Amino acid sequence: HPDNVSPAIFGNLSASCTTDDNEAVTVTYNVDERFNFLALIPNFETSTEEARKVMPKEILLKDALYSLSRLGAVIKAFETYNLPLLKKVMGDKIHEPYRKEIIHEYDKVRNICQKIDSAAFFISGSGSTLMNIVSDEKNIEKIKTELAKLEYKWQPILLKVDTKGTLVID
């Protein structure tokens, strides 16, 4: 899948698709380096196969429009470090409502993050890792303390955006 490989190769945020001629096309968008991505990695896994099985065969047009209509604003928020905008427009009705059901403690983890510090919260790929964008690194310890009270072990890891991608060193 080009959408899995392109961020590692190009860095930043990328969007990939396959054309009608079966050509892979990738475009990249700059992401402001001030973003703090907090990966929340649990001590359990969900398989991509399992995550695909919970998806409905069809989605409502209003749900597709809800998610797709926000895309431009989400990209702009990432480019400009606009946390208030990101918080308003980050939302998904295509896969998250279904895939969250196979991620233990999803709602509890989301509630902890939203209570303490969350500009955006989403499932990373098909799961089971969750991603929380924090505005202040100082809040990571508070989140970590609350996560430790849950049944499953959640390891928070602070990540910064890779703006360069893969580098070839001679």
State what each model feature region is.
Residues H1-F35, F121-I123, G127, M131:
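Alpha/beta catalytic cores of group-transfer enzymes, especially the acyltransferase/condensing modules
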Residues I9-G11, D32-F35, Y66-G72, Y81, ...:
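Short gly/pro-enriched beta-turn/loop segments at secondary-structure junctions
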Residues G11, N43, K160-D162:
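Short, solvent-exposed coil/turn elements at secondary-structure transition points
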Residues T18, P42, N132-D136:
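Short beta-strand-to-loop capping motifs
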Residues A39-E101:
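Active-site rim beta-loop-alpha module in soluble metabolic enzymes
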Residues F78-D170:
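Glycine-rich, charge-dense phosphate/pyrophosphate-binding loop(s)
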